[in-house]
Design a protein with these regions (language model features):
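Bacterial Sec-dependent signal peptides at the C-terminal "C-region" and cleavage site
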Residues: 12-20
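Blade-loop segments of beta-propeller domains
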Residues: 85-87
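Extracellular/luminal recognition modules and glycoprotein regions
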Residues: 19-82, 91-95, 99, 106-107, ...
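Short, low-complexity, Pro/Ser/Thr/Gly-rich segments in the mature regions of secreted, periplasmic
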Residues: 159-174
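Sec-dependent N-terminal signal peptides
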Residues: 4-13
Length: 174
């Protein structure tokens, strides 16, 4: 009987958890925990990232539907960042910045990239999924008009630990 109750509670808690975190664009939700959302260009799929205590939750799927992928990111375990600055001139007074946030699950890496081009050209965001840190399975641009970003230029991002793994899937302008 005790096992049945525990099993029932586990199902109930996972159902409640999956109901709470669905892929949404910012304009369509009032969830205060949403820190990033965007729609994949030429697709109906949406990426949402929620902040829950010290964790970031990556959610992928059709907007408002049950998530196809949920990853609970914990710093120093499976949640990391990387960044790069590229000087635009010899004086190094103008730079492009590239910011990357990584969610790692087993041998897969889910990478969201933000390229801040400071008006030189339009800023851009991409989603890349890699297997074994080298084989790129998915690499799509995010629709800039749908992006809600309260993540990349915040203390939350700055406090994330750096990724020390292989960086073959980072696309940089160097």
């Amino acid at each position: 009987m005790k096992k049945i109750i525990i099993f029932f509670l586990m199902i109930l808690s996972s159902t409640i958890f999956s109901e709470e975190y669905k892929p949404y664009l910012k304009k369509n939700t009032n969830n205060k925990n949403l820190v990033f959302s965007a729609q994949i260009k030429d697709s109906k799929k949406v990426i949402s990232i929620y902040k829950e205590n010290k964790k970031l939750i990556y959610v992928y799927g059709s907007e408002g539907e049950k998530a196809e992928k949920i990853i609970i990111g914990t710093t120093n375990k499976n949640l990391f960042k990387n960044e790069n600055e590229i000087p635009l001139n010899e004086n190094n007074n103008n730079k492009l910045t590239e910011n990357f946030i990584l969610f790692k699950v087993k041998n897969y890496t889910y990478l969201i990239s933000f390229y801040n081009n400071y008006g030189v050209k339009e800023n851009s965001y991409t989603l890349t999924v890699a297997k074994n840190d080298e084989e790129i399975l998915f690499d799509k641009e995010l629709d800039i008009s749908t992006v809600y970003d309260n993540l990349f230029n915040t203390n939350l991002f700055k406090k994330l630990p750096y990724d020390n793994g292989v960086v073959a899937y980072y696309v940089t302008y160097d």
